[in-house]
């Protein structure tokens, strides 16, 4: 198995390892700044002189175009997808993002890159498909594109999409259960709002509220499971948990903790009995958002299940292909 190159945050090799994620972050900054560029001015203190600083106020025609955020998001997600695909040309370098103490937080390998392609690909298609679908629908008359000029909700929608992609990417890269949970919640909160984004539609608002309530309960139960695993092992690192399961894997505390953690991932893949909000969420959301829920969100839940079941819960399972060997092969891809 090839060696892992350890890289500290913002050290040598950091940008190359997390290039797709940094592209997403740059796109987020662009979505926050560019749609707000306008004819804003500020007064110099103690004077009556006003200076234009191109932020706020009446926006320019191009920056107020409702399709501009869609193009920024589509190009950003598409660039992240292409960068992820290109990383396979010469083989994926196994790079770990570590703290000063050497603790692994993120791991870039073939396993994570494959799921990142799924996430970024699905979100790219959804962002492009939403370009002409954000006109208000439901209650009241449908607005034309011209009526949507200076409507800042357009940028909000795509900011949520990029935030969702960033959270999903963290889930794929995580080597610590708490880091994985942070990525899961970052993506989940974005999807809650995306489902209920059409505030003019009663169906969308109700669907988003149900999705949020069920998801919050599942996340709370999962977080309680994390605390039980930390109490048992003293760490949430996957390798530490796997080693502890080899020694004391039959203790009731970690088994209960694993069960609680799986509740959170079960909600993301709409596994029974955590599927109650799924039908409303799919019907209340727009078609592109429903597509993200059906593909990228499900893939994110599968990553969590693989991390827990193949790495932690059964590190020495026997059979045609043991779980630990499968994990090592995934690390080597």
Label each PLM-derived region with a short phrase:
Residues 1-333:
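Alpha-helical transmembrane segments of multi-pass membrane proteins predominantly involved
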């Amino acid at each position: 198995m090839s060696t892992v190159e350890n890289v500290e945050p913002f050290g040598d090799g950091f940008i190359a390892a997390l290039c797709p994620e940094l592209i997403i972050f740059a796109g987020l900054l662009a979505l926050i700044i560019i749609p707000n560029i306008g004819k804003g001015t500020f007064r110099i203190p103690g004077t009556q002189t006003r200076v234009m600083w191109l932020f706020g106020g009446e926006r320019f025609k191009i920056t107020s175009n409702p399709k501009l955020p869609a193009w920024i998001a589509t190009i950003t997600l598409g660039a992240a997808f292409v960068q992820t695909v290109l990383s396979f040309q010469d083989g994926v370098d196994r790079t770990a993002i570590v703290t000063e103490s050497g603790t692994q937080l993120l791991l870039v390998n073939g396993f994570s890159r494959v799921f990142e392609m799924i996430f970024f690909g699905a979100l790219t298609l959804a962002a492009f498909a939403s370009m002409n679908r954000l006109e208000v629908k439901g209650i009241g008359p449908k607005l034309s594109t011209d009526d949507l000029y200076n409507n800042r909700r357009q940028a909000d929608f795509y900011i949520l999409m990029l935030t969702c992609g960033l959270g999903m990417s963290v889930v794929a890269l995580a080597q610590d259960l708490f880091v994985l949970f942070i990525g899961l919640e970052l993506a989940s909160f974005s999807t809650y709002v995306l489902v209920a984004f059409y505030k003019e539609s009663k169906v969308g608002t109700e669907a988003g509220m149900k999705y949020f309530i069920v998801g919050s309960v599942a996340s709370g139960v999962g977080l309680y499971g994390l605390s039980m695993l930390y109490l048992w092992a003293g760490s949430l690192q996957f390798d530490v948990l796997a080693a502890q399961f080899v020694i004391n894997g039959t203790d009731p505390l970690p088994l209960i903790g694993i069960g609680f953690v799986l509740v959170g991932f079960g909600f993301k893949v709409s596994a029974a009995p955590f599927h109650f909000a799924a039908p409303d969420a799919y019907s209340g959301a727009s078609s592109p958002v429903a597509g993200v829920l059906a593909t990228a969100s499900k893939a994110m839940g599968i990553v969590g299940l693989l991390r827990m079941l193949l790495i932690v819960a059964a590190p020495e399972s026997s059979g045609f292909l043991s779980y630990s060997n499968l994990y090592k092969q995934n690390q080597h891809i």
